[in-house]
Amino acid sequence: MVHFTAEEKVAITSLWSKMNVEEAGGEALGRLLVVYPWTQRFFDNFGNLSSPSAILGNPKVKAHGKKVLTSFGDAIKNMDNLKTTFAKLSELHCDKLHVDPENFRLLGNVMVIILATHFGKEFTPEVQAAWQKLVSAVAIALGHKYH
């Protein structure tokens, strides 16, 4: 289990409270699909993913990205209990969807990039460290069923 300090929790929640989940979710998932094109195989029912502009403009990518970031909000509300929070999603992604758990780490790293671009100077090294810790812990929790 990962322990978050009070300072880390404040750094995470204060930035999250300013996040536009719909916009950032589509951007994060879209960036994942563009930068790591092999992840597209999990989204073959999303229609046109033939180019970066097609991916970033795809309404299914945006909708699923919002869903992903909404789930990420659950992590922020339950930072002290991530394994339980993501148990069902871990099972779904492992047993039904067969997603490579490495993709969770990649998505977390994309999230950190999105935060940096959206929040600029507010995204200090200390804030980045807190967020990196969180996205790593979420990736581990999502990959739990695989072990």
UniProtKB/Swiss-Prot annotation:
SUPFAM superfamilies: Globin-like. Red blood cells. GO terms for cellular component: blood microparticle; haptoglobin-hemoglobin complex; hemoglobin complex. Gene3D superfamilies: Globins (1.10.490.10). The keyword Transport applies. Residues 3-147 form the Globin domain. GO terms for biological process: hydrogen peroxide catabolic process. Signal peptide: none annotated. One of its GO terms (molecular function) is haptoglobin binding. The modification Phosphoserine is found at residues 14, 51. Heterotetramer of two alpha chains and two epsilon chains in early embryonic hemoglobin Gower-2; two zeta chains and two epsilon chains in early embryonic hemoglobin Gower-1. The epsilon chain is a beta-type chain of early mammalian embryonic hemoglobin. This is Hemoglobin subunit epsilon. It comes from Cebus olivaceus (Weeper capuchin). The lineage of its organism: Eukaryota, Metazoa, Chordata, Craniata, Vertebrata. The gene is HBE1.
